[in-house]
């Protein structure tokens, strides 16, 4: 009986699907009351934990991202639910689930959180009821044609946190270089990607395409969804997923110095340059670069494992020219093919 109380699957479900993580059976069957019983039980237990600590549980993040297409297509129980509730398709089934769970949370004085999928492509009637129940929705998949997602969410009434993969996914590799570990499905994310994010002009937050080619930011918003409710852009958030993490040194390497730009955009959502005047961007970037360079000295003193970018080099008129990313950096070299050390000759 207890097992039936929390049953979350359809024994006769023949749906065939594959999730982004290559699973074939990782979706709850929301036609079963056991799903709701389980979710409500988890919320109750969380409330008890918070209460034991002398706190009130204010927000529960529901997740809700990347539900694979086809996950309910061949479930007799879902078909029966759709007929009983007058639901037309799987998207309306998900709306039914989100509406019920957020209503339950609201009755307990708890706000919901979720990834962008929970707030996309719903009718105004749904948004009018459900959006006020959310404390935050994270906009994450913002590459290319999906760059308008943060503004679609905000305009629909959802409190939106910019969690853009193109700017704030810390586990993306710094560059394409073989020595830079990390993922690259959403592009590359270095210490400048978070810094040049523009929460209130989000289309200019992507200054380079996947191949590193500079984009025309002055034209990036043409024909795209405008931000009509800026009050619903409530913050920025960095993500560090653990698929590629092997030790804490790697955590530090991914985060430092990327998080300086994230922190700056959290405090100052409107960058200090004018994209119509390229010289102001260059000056602002140089100023940021100098500040980061100073902080690296502090990180080094404290023993953190941070990344220093590769030096640049080119041969011009038979002479090797070398530069560095941050002011004051020294480049050590050898002439015998051995690995340079701190005691090797310094390039001047």
Regions picked out by a protein language model, each given a short descriptive name:
Residues 1, 31, 63-65, 113-117, ...:
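Generic beta-strand/beta-sheet core signal
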Residues 275-348:
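Short, compositionally stereotyped local motifs that mark structural "simplifiers"
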Residues 29-33, 37, 88, 92-96, ...:
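Soluble non-cytosolic domains of exported or imported proteins
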Residues 112, 160, 331:
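Hydrophobic anchor at the start of a short beta-strand
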Residues 37-48, 53-132, 136:
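Gly/Pro-rich turn-and-neighbor structural signature
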Residues 106, 111, 152, 180, ...:
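Domain-scale activation on soluble regions of proteins
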